[in-house]
């Protein structure tokens, strides 16, 4: 799984995931499924915000090629991936500027067009189950929830999907590609099932001669949100940098 992640995700996303796991004492060589899940969630957050801007008239537009002469503002503020202190600083600044209610938990994005925080979910299970879990945890009508699955399903608060169909289709296609490439490598079952993940982990460690003394239980604890965001993600060049990660994963 680790090799798969390094092959199929943008190196910057991999680096952010590595830093996040290290910060919280998680070993990516053991928690490989978590490593893949963090990378996937972070990529979806960036794909969600990518290409979307607000023009001088306050209208939401899509721009795939940056025009240095255009006075555009990113429609979405990315909160996911920042260190905790900076993330809350950004949230507080948004609340002070817009009058939005401060969320209890750190959200993933802020939508300047709709003036609301957004929580993004990527699930290997039924979308409605994961949506209810998110809603029960957040317990706030002011944070918009949008859930994607690897099967192309999605669910959002009040069926308001925020993005246009083309943008959402791009995210769904990427998730479906990840699923297919995992399946081609025999990794999908272990990614979905903790029981299968345990078997795969023991098999991998045994083949490396590292099985002794290592845990055999796979943690089901939810990973904390990524806390580190490189400055490059917020500049005008992030579109070009991310574009490489939309490509199909290379096959072995």
Swiss-Prot record:
UniProt entry keywords in alphabetical sequence: Decay of host mRNAs by virus, Eukaryotic host gene expression shutoff by virus, Host cytoplasm, Host gene expression shutoff by virus, Host mRNA suppression by virus, Host nucleus, Host-virus interaction
One of the Pfam families matching this protein, by short name: Flu_PA
Residues at the active site: 80, 108
Domain of life: Viruses
Site (Important for efficient shutoff activity): 28, 65, 202-203, 206
Annotated site location: Important for efficient shutoff activity and nuclear localization: 195, 198-199
Subcellular location: Host cytoplasm; Host nucleus
Transmembrane segments: none
Protein name, as recorded: Protein PA-X
Organism: Influenza A virus (strain A/Korea/426/1968 H2N2)
Gene designation: PA
